[in-house]
Amino acid sequence: MNKTKRKIFETSMKLFAEKGYDATSIEDITATVGVAKGTLYYHFSSKEEIFNFLVEEGIKLLQNSIDIKTSKLESYIDKIKAIILIEIKIVVKYEDLITILLSQFWGKEARNQKCQKHIYEYINKIEEIVKSGIEVGEIKQGNTKAIASEIYGLICSALIFKLRNNGEIDIMKLYKEFESTIIKGLK
């Protein structure tokens, strides 16, 4: 991604998180980035395309981080622990992006449905790990969809925790608390 596109990406992410999708205009984005509309339209055909790009990049970031980390682990419990830590770290580093993903998850518009589709794909990856853990006896029998959704829900929990604590978050302390609760429930 070139410098201008990255700046549009980062600025849009911040504006969408602060103002919401509907209240953010192309003019807001171009004024904040400091580029002409033509420059923005060279990189993105519409506000909707910018939003879709943000969602896709955000989910890719989560999936790639998890794929890299979990591919090196043999234990399915360790894979779940890695997912928990990655999700907390991503909330801390990319709070605006997570705010957008969570806020746009609800609704029936095309952008909401695309967001839901990407999030469901991510949750399905978690569910595959849970199913495999059940098959080998590392994880007790249970509703794999519910378990995977709960693990994804840690993103929301971490964000709420961060906001309630004025942005202060001890990653490892929060990880230990989430990990303890989740892993106890899986064994």
Which residue ranges define each predicted feature?
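Basic, helix-initiating cap at the start of DNA-binding domains
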Residues: M1-K19, T24-V35, E49
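Short coil/turn segments at alpha/beta junctions that flank glycine-rich nucleotide-binding fingerprints
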Residues: E18-D22, L73, Y94, V136-G137
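Short hydrophobic/aromatic patch on the recognition helix
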Residues: G34-F44
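Alpha-helical DNA-contacting segments of helix-turn-helix folds
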Residues: N52-G58
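Hydrophobic alpha-helical connector segments
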Residues: F53, D67-K93, I147-I151
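Amphipathic alpha-helical packing segments from all-alpha helical-bundle domains
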Residues: K60-Q63, D67, K93, R111-V136, ...
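Amphipathic alpha-helical segments used for helix-helix packing
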Residues: I86, I90-A110, I160-R164
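C-terminal peripheral helix-coil segments that are non-catalytic and often amphipathic
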Residues: K89, N124-S132, L154, N165-K187
